[in-house]
Amino acid sequence: GIIAVEVANIYSTLGSEVNIIARSKALKEIDSDIKDYIFKNLLSEINILEETDVVECEKNKVITNKNEELEGVPFFATGRVANSEIVRDIVELNPDNTLKVNEMMETTKEHVYAAGDVTGGYQLTPVARMEGITAARNMANYPNKVVYHAIPQTLSLNTEVSFVEDEKNNCSEEDKVDIGIPGIAGPGAFWKILSGDTGYTKISFDKKQNKIKKINSISPSSVSDVAYLSYLMRINSPLDEYGDFLEIHPSTDANYKIIKSMWL
């Protein structure tokens, strides 16, 4: 998963030899083109073993179901377990032991609210903050419902990888248009021009509704770029409105002009 890859990248950058063992596919939630770029350009020093299980784990080695013995200190990044024991007899839990809440972040016990990782769902700091604000407003008798729509996410590597998808847009493959371009050198990427590792951006459009379906960006500025683009997706802005932005150079202004020319 994402956390495993982030931790692996840290140790690899520090000079360690790193193996990632994935029970299914590594980064399966990432667009295939973006994943290929990540493996080739950002994680090239890391050995990735997919469709592999660990059958034996010792202090300084692991043995896989493919009879491979890998030496080194094992580091587990297999997800989180909700620490909900303290309220098990007070509120109702989901099958995975997370707290069951409604869209106002209220648990099954009236006037008891919960937010963040303990409720399951998106285990991201900004989402936990959004849930906490929703819960606080409802506690203060300001009715508010949490909305999980076009949630931006990032994979923190030596170059940030950010992505967002409008899951409410069910455009067909016939109506979907994909545009991918290399990253344009800018702050944080000037010295990568010679290697060609300036990043990559891929955007999927719904040509019928004139809306953005999905954005994937590998860029030093992708965290902020995708964050505000996700807001435009949440308020259902058509593509034409994206051209009204006047941005500070150098940022995404050049990217927008290129993508617009390719689309039109």
Residue ranges of predicted features:
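General small-molecule cofactor/ligand-binding pocket signal
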Residues: 47-49, 113, 180
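Rossmann-like dinucleotide-binding cores of NAD(P)H-dependent redox enzymes
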Residues: 2-56, 137, 143-170
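FAD-site-proximal beta/loop scaffold in flavoenzymes
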Residues: 69, 73-138
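Cysteine/selenocysteine-centered motifs that mediate thiol-based redox chemistry or coordinate metal-sulfur cofactors
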Residues: 144, 235-264
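A short, polar/charged loop-to-alpha-helix boundary motif
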Residues: 222-235
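Mid-to-C-terminal Rossmann-like scaffold of FAD/NAD(P)H-dependent oxidoreductases
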Residues: 118-223, 261-264
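Conserved beta-strand-loop-beta-strand element in the redox core of flavoprotein oxidoreductases
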Residues: 57-68, 74
